[in-house]
Design a protein with these regions (language model features):
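Phosphate-binding glycine-rich loops and adjacent basic patches that engage nucleotide phosphates
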Residues: 1-8, 32-44, 125-134, 160-169
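Post-cleavage N-terminal segment of exported redox proteins
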Residues: 2-84, 102-107, 187-191, 197-215
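Short glycine/threonine-rich turn/loop motifs
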Residues: 55-170, 175-182
């Protein structure tokens, strides 16, 4: 929890490692002067190289293995529209995950911000509105990737759920109504109404996104 000034000073005057940070910054950015902005850019570029692509799901897509029947059912539920079609036009009795966690770039995130129905009000946890000042951003938080989600408990932006079972139960319930709850949530129609075996299948699919070679 040191300040950026301390970080930059340590990088500029590092006498304890074999790395020549000023020279490395010169090679990357054309200057030996290390700044907070350039350090952030360097870290961000490194993080972008950290790509998980060897989960069971990836191997299945490459034809190297098979998903179990339960995992495949979970995948189909993941891709289907939620809700009873008699109540929700277009409903397919699915898990409705794809809207926010579709396969965009196969990172399983739309990289957007959503209110996923955790709380009825946001006085103590405002969300994106703290950044934008736009009232309709109240209670909105960024969609995380689902890769290695089985290894990343606790869940939600505030860590309120300790297991994937709790997460699935939350979405199955439809969430808590609020002024900015996402239209993809099924709070007005009693939730997704997934059966126990369907919830188990969805969780099995989420486990198939685990890539231990990446950890």
């Amino acid at each position: 929890n040191v300040t950026w000034e301390v970080v930059v000073e340590r990088l500029m005057n590092d006498d304890f490692s074999e790395l020549d940070y000023p020279q490395m910054f010169f090679d990357a950015f054309g200057t030996e002067i290390i700044t907070e902005d350039l350090t952030v850019k360097a870290i961000a570029q490194f993080i972008r190289t950290m790509i998980s692509a060897n989960s069971k799901f990836d191997k299945w897509r490459r034809g190297e293995t098979d998903l179990s029947d339960l995992e495949y059912l979970g995948y189909q539920l993941f891709l289907k529209e939620g809700g009873d079609p008699e109540i929700n036009p277009g409903g397919e009795f699915g898990a409705d995950c794809f809207h926010c966690h579709g396969e965009a770039g196969l990172q399983f995130s739309d990289y957007l911000f959503h209110n996923n129905g955790l709380d009825p009000s946001f006085e103590n946890d405002p969300g994106r509105v703290n950044v934008t000042g736009f009232v309709l951003d109240s209670g909105l938080f960024k969609t995380p990737t689902l890769r290695n989600v089985a290894l990343s408990a606790p869940y939600m932006h505030d860590g309120r759920f300790n297991s994937l079972e709790e997460v699935v139960d939350h979405y199955n319930s439809g969430g808590v109504s609020s002024s900015t709850i996402d239209t993809f949530m099924k709070y007005t129609t009693g939730g997704l109404e997934l059966a126990p075996q369907q919830k188990k299948a969805l969780i099995a699919f989420l486990h198939a996104l685990r890539d231990t070679t990446f950890i």
